[in-house]
Amino acid sequence: MVATGGQAQKQSQNQKPDVLSPTSAVTGLPQKRYYRQRAHSNPIADHSFDYPARPEDVDWRSMYPSIQQGQQVSFADIGCGYGGFLVTLGEMFPEKLSIGMEIRVKVSDYVVDRIAALRRKCADTGAYQNVACLRTNAMKYLPNYFAKGQLEKMFFLYPDPHFKRAKHKWRIINQALLSEYAYVLRKGGLVYTMTDVEDLHKWIVTHMEEHPLYERITEEEANADPITPKLYQSSEEGAKVVRNKGDHFLAIFRRL
């Protein structure tokens, strides 16, 4: 269902969990135990989403109250989970607008409430006005939100590996989707990928290296990037991998 203007965003921002979800008395943040949901969602299923017909219809001000005239979203965390890395991006790049895109309703509700709580806590400094979360299916509707060459950075951190061969087509990195990502990513922009599944890592590297619009950056470039250390445990999934002493597989690609 196509929604005009900022209708889709306002609906996403106004969504609340089915039960009253108290905040932590210590942190003042919403508690994840009230927002539990399955680890993954079928991206091919016919979920009911409202989405803009074109990027010009997106009402970004409903998500970024302090957005400046002409300012655009620069960073997109695709499948942002519970928003740990998204919040880190907001702290690292206060002058940039970052959006988290998450398909799971309760998880996206949590991130929206988390950001709202952080904004209240930091009302005197205006922190976290530069981050927001949107519930949508990025595999279907990404070009509805972003103009050609708009994004500087895209992040795919610990995506669903879809282990069964029959479900590989559901993986968020594939040849068709890589062309869509290239469309919304500016030349010289970066795609960051991180997973704890070696087979998925090899799949990602193979597909991106085969695509004519990407090149993998060198290890030296990756190590010099201030974002790289944050990829390992800023997200909740990454922190879990660290706790379990699991492997991390990183690959960063440049848009040609």
From Swiss-Prot:
The active site is at 160. Keywords: Methyltransferase, Nucleus, RNA-binding, S-adenosyl-L-methionine, Transferase, tRNA processing, tRNA-binding. Residues 1-24 are annotated as: Disordered. One of its GO terms (molecular function) is tRNA binding. It is found in: Nucleus. One of its GO terms (cellular component) is tRNA (m7G46) methyltransferase complex. This is tRNA (guanine-N(7)-)-methyltransferase.
